Design a protein with these regions (language model features):
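N-terminal beta1-alpha1 cap of cysteine-dependent amidohydrolase-like domains
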Residues: 1-128, 139, 146, 150-184, ...
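Active-site loop->helix "elbow" adjoining a glycine-rich segment at hydrolase catalytic centers
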Residues: 132-134, 141
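Active-site-proximal beta-strand elements of phosphoester/diester hydrolases
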Residues: 231-234
Length: 270
């Protein structure tokens, strides 16, 4: 039986590195397929008192196949799941063909994460998506994406500036009456980092928009329908330095997610 007092175990979907990436050496560890966890995500969760556990992906070339891995066992063993950022969502995952060779995305990761989403939702465990995680959650429930904002939505602000990464920022506005807005009483919005070139085009049925970019209206935060906890943001909360007065303090978002994870654990040990 799980100890309710033990630290929460939060799964983090793996980022994938495939050999042959431009500019990378073709020797040593770089000649291997890597599954990895960006350290800021780990530190963000650890800072909230949780223990991050990376969940690896498998594909048709793996020695271990999907049929050998019961994803519901991951969902049963862990208290929640974070979908971390990374490569583009593949256009094929939402019924489109890539408009440019650089926008192929990561179909393998898409498939694995969509299966993880289903397993955790079925187990009644909370999910939180970051950047790509927001986009994939939207796609998993029937939404679509802009493959490239500058090309397909030229009225958009710059949401990614080469060389600046998370140093690039813009203002967001909370949608009144939403759970996200309730976490920040008395505030209409804030500033966040921005380092993405894709974004939500068609919102998944039943999902609620919780924040938008103040400058162009692009969706920046969503919440899924039903009694479970499905939430995601387009920015990277793990890159926000605690106490930085220029940026949103994401501690309330993390605490809200971990509170849901603790509640899910209590339900699982009844």
């Amino acid at each position: 039986m799980r100890n309710e007092a033990a630290p929460l175990l939060i799964g983090v979907s793996a980022r994938l590195y495939t050999p042959g990436a431009a500019g990378m050496p073709a020797q040593g560890v770089w000649s291997k397929t890597l599954h990895y966890l960006e350290q800021s995500v780990a530190w963000w969760l650890l800072g909230g008192g949780a223990l991050p556990v990376m969940v690896p992906a498998v594909d048709a070339t793996s020695i271990v196949q999907r049929s050998d891995i019961a994803l519901h066992d991951y969902a049963a063993a862990l208290d929640g799941l974070v979908l971390q950022g990374g490569n583009d969502v593949a256009p094929q995952s939402y019924g489109e063909a890539p408009l440019h060779p650089d926008w192929q995305g990561d179909r393998v990761r898409d498939r694995c994460e969509i299966e993880l989403i289903r397993a955790f939702v079925a187990a009644g465990k909370p999910l939180f998506g970051i950047c790509r995680g927001l986009q994939l959650l939207n796609v998993a429930y029937g939404g679509t994406l802009w493959q490239d904002l500058p090309t397909q939505r030229p009225q958009s602000l710059e949401h990614r500036v080469s060389g600046r990464d998370e140093q690039h920022q813009h203002a967001i506005e909370f949608v009144p009456g939403t759970r996200l807005a309730a976490l920040y009483p008395g505030r209409s919005g804030s500033h966040t980092n921005s380092l993405h070139h894709q974004g939500i085009k068609d919102l998944a049925p039943g999902f609620v928009v919780e924040a938008r970019c103040a400058g162009d209206g692009l969706i920046e935060a969503v919440r899924g329908p039903g009694p479970g906890y499905l939430a995601a943001v387009q920015w990277h909360p793990e890159f926000h330095a605690p106490g930085d007065p220029r940026l949103l303090d994401d501690g309330a978002i993390l605490a809200d997610f971990l509170t849901a994870a603790a509640a899910a654990r209590r339900e699982s040990v009844k």
